[in-house]
Amino acid sequence: MEYAAIHHQPFSTDAYSYDGRTVHIKIRTKKGDADHIRFIWGDPYEYNDGKWSANEQPMRKIAATEMHDYWFAEVVPPFRRLQYAFVVTDDHEDIFFGSSGVCPYNEKTLETIHYYFKFPFVHEADTFQAPEWVKSTVWYQIFPERFANGREDLSPKNALPWGSKDPGVNDFFGGDLQGIVDKLDYLEDLGVNGIYLTPIFSAPSNHKYDTLDYFSIDPHFGDPEIFRTLVSQLHQRGMRIMLDAVFNHIGSASPQWQDVVKNGDQSRYKDWFHIHSFPVTDDNYDRFAFTADMPKLNTANPEVQKYLLDIALYWIREFDIDGWRLDVANEVDHVFWKTFRQAVSTEKPDVYILGEIWHSAEPWLRGDEFHAAMNYPFTEPMIEYFADQTISASRMAHRVNAHLMNGMKQANEVMFNLLDSHDTKRLLTRCRNDEKKARALLAFMFAQTGSPCIYYGTEIGLDGENDPLCRKCMVWEKEKQNQDMLQFMKRLIALRKQENTLLTEGHLEWNLLDDKNDFISFSRTLDEKILIYFFNQGNVVQHISLRELNIDRNNKICDAWTEQPLHYHDVIAVQPGEFLILSAAAPV
């Protein structure tokens, strides 16, 4: 047994409160090393005849990566206190693993209390809690300047005719909030029930990430009344809205920064920024990346903190928005985000807080900052397998597993899953315009735990390279839309909403990872219901014999996509590039 590979970290994603009563426990071992693991646990104060009273239960292997296996146990401590350890078994030995590491498995070890891990008390206040509604939300991201032009009188004077050319960095086409209101029937018919808008606040650019005034809507987008109408109509339709907050930096044309430029070290705003010396030049202050027109805010400054918190609360109080997406969230200090979380959650307990983080976001997802992150590390291996074809099926699955194991279950359940955005190539372009690959990728992502998001235009076959080409004008002429893709997305969204509880909370198990033939199968299981997915990315037809699957022959089986009933003895062909979803449930 490889002792050095055994890992468990208390008070982390390895040991946490799931719901204020239930504790989730994970331990990692070398892949293929352990035959089974027993979880020893009990209340630290409970003794019988002078000996600590311990319970014992088997752990379940729930995931594997290229190098490790992950094991899981779930317990409900009667008095919300927990003392625990592990007994790891292979072909040759049993070992005890606890707070002192690996120890011999014997009576003396079992009776040495300080060898055990402790979970002193399961506090609800310490439990990661996210808004329940996010679990059933399918998001639709809108870049307002390119979605729809509802009021041409608001368009910038230099606005180009809608969709007349591929967008340049500084082009305007006149998209606005009225355009979004006008298309709500379309969005409702598509099936999405959450709208994420990139920034709508006053700013000189088309993207609005260079904010002038966070309290006002950009005049080319509309005014407070049309935004109020948008929020109201969304809520009437059972839909949510999330705004984009740029709190890492501000626009260089903002009054605060211009005051610093004018008055130097005499400016009342000089400590709002990270300025190295005066007077301000193009290279003596911190900014977003190396972008001169986006000076970085000093969020350790109490005045800046109050300013930003007032903004966050204003849009909740005045317009009842449902969430904040936080731009460049990983470059803002944790202290501020903890204060932000407390303030906005007190104002609206079910507000959704989403951070833009492109790497592992675990430090921000401990229950006192964000509910979720934009889940690029989770979906990137999917894209690399299906679209880029640069990794194998097993490599993809291992990376997906590793990412899931790095998070708490309740955090994974509300993560923001996306395949493209205003910052990336569009999905169809990443797939080299192979529509089958794009469909397979979407179906694969929609089968995973988390809250899925599609970028405007994906549903009608919009393509585009990296920024600015990924920000094309939405196509509204039906004859120019890919209607087959649109119908596909409607069905995919409907299926996700229909099976939402299973796809959010159900167990993921990889049934087959055939690297040679590029054929994948996995299942999502919850209670008596199971969905089994098959993806054929190879060049050969694959045949599925239902009787060879792990399905009770008395179960009701159907093709989940077409809802066509199937029979236990059926054999189904999965063509190259296609996928199949089977549904099986115990008869009612």
Swiss-Prot record:
Catalytic residues at 327, 356
Highest classification ranks of the organism? Bacteria, Bacillati, Bacillota, Bacilli, Bacillales
GO terms for CC?
A: cytoplasm
Q: How does activity depend on temperature?
A: Optimum temperature is 40-45 degrees Celsius.
Q: Localized where?
A: Cytoplasm
The note on cofactor binding and number reads:
Binds 1 Ca(2+) ion per subunit.
Q: What does this protein do?
A: Hydrolyzes beta-cyclodextrin to maltose and glucose, soluble starch to maltose and glucose, and pullulan to panose with trace amounts of maltose and glucose. It is also able to hydrolyze acarbose. Can also exhibit a transglycosylation activity transferring glucose or maltose to another moiety of sugars by forming alpha-(1,6)- and alpha-(1,3)-glycosidic linkages upon the hydrolysis of substrate at concentrations of 5% or higher.
Query: Does the keyword Cytoplasm feature in the UniProt annotation?
Result: yes
- Can you name this protein? Intracellular maltogenic amylase
Q: Which Gene Ontology molecular function entries are recorded, alphabetically?
A: hydrolase activity, hydrolyzing O-glycosyl compounds; metal ion binding
**What EC number(s) are associated with this protein in UniProt?**
3.2.1.-
Organism per entry = Bacillus subtilis
Q: What are the BP-aspect GO terms? A: carbohydrate metabolic process
Site feature location: Transition state stabilizer? 423
Q: What domain of life does the UniProt record list for this protein's source? A: Bacteria
Its needed co-factors are: Ca(2+)
Q: Which residues does the annotation say bind Ca(2+)?
A: 149, 155, 174, 176
Please describe the quaternary structure of this protein: Monomer or homodimer; in equilibrium.
UniProt keyword terms in alphabetical order: Calcium, Carbohydrate metabolism, Cytoplasm, Glycosidase, Hydrolase, Metal-binding
Q: Name one Pfam family in it.
A: Alpha-amylase
Instruction: Provide the pH dependence.
Output: Optimum pH is 7.0. Stable at pH 6.0 and about 80% of the enzyme activity remained between pH 7.0 and pH 8.0.
For binding substrate, which residues are annotated in this chain's numbering? 249, 325, 422-423, 467, 471
Gene name for this UniProt entry:
bbmA
